[in-house]
Structure formats: structure tokens, C-alpha cells
Amino acid sequence: SFSVKKGQTIAFVGSTGSGKSSIINLFLRFYEFERGQILIDGRDIKDYSQAELRRKIGLVLQDPFLYHGTVASNIQLYQEQLTREEIIEAAKFVDAHGFISQLPQGYDAPVTERGATFSSGQRQLLAFARTIATKPKILILDEATANIDSETEELIQVSLRKMRRGRTTI
């Protein structure tokens, strides 16, 4: 059992296989549980629809997946209501706008499957922009700073500090 207060940052530390990722999967209801509760704003997560939960919780993984499309469509992913201005605002917030605007086609630049043409840090910044665009109340970072290239490491650390501000972060 544990509690996380609104706006608090906590970390789960343990060896491989100790259950860190399992806890994340429980938060996101990828796994269902039979005993206990996970409450968000005093409400059991089982009472939220998957769509409601996804709007409340932003997930950034160690190895973000980018999809075939454009830079903008990867930030917008499944959030069709986002405008171009909101996409750019999210990219600026996480300091991705600089490298995106240097691409020949900017936000319309093509992205190959898995984002092979981008550095690991650039892929992570795009994943941060995708997450922040949904304005989640809770951030879940699953080793989000692992395997980052030195060129974008500082940008990622600054972006993470900004992203965590005012949000519960796990």
C-alpha cells in the first residue's frame, strides 16, 4: 500500500522483476486487480472508462514508439481535436520546437516507422510533446530518461522538470 498526494513526485526503485512495471500497468488498467483500490481524486480507477483514464494519465516509456506519418500526427496521436497551434504549443513546452522547425518540412516532416531518422532524445521529446498535449493530471514515466543521446539530454531534463510542475508524477 502507498499513497501519492496531488502534485507529489514519487519513484519506484527495485531490481529487474521486482514489480515496478506491474504497478504502472495497474495504474493504467492494463492489468485488472482483485483486491485493493487505486483512487484518483477519491474515485476508484475501475469507475473510470479507459478513455477517461487515458485523458487523466500521461505515459512516457523508455523507448517511445513513433508511427509512420508526420511529426505533427505523431504528437497529435489519437487526439484529433488538437489544433496545429496546440501541437506547436506542446512541442514548444517540451523544447522540441527547435529541432522540429529545423526540419525541411517542419511539423509536416515525414516520420518513418519507429522514428528511425530521429535521435533517441528527439524521439523522447516528441513523446513528451504527445503526452503534454493531452494535459494529463498524472504523469507516469517508465525509465523515460534511459538511453538518451548526450545531444538532447539537457533538453530532456529541463522538459521533465517543466512537465512535472503541478502534476502528480510517478
Sequence positions of predicted segments:
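ABC-type nucleotide-binding domain
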Residues: 1-170
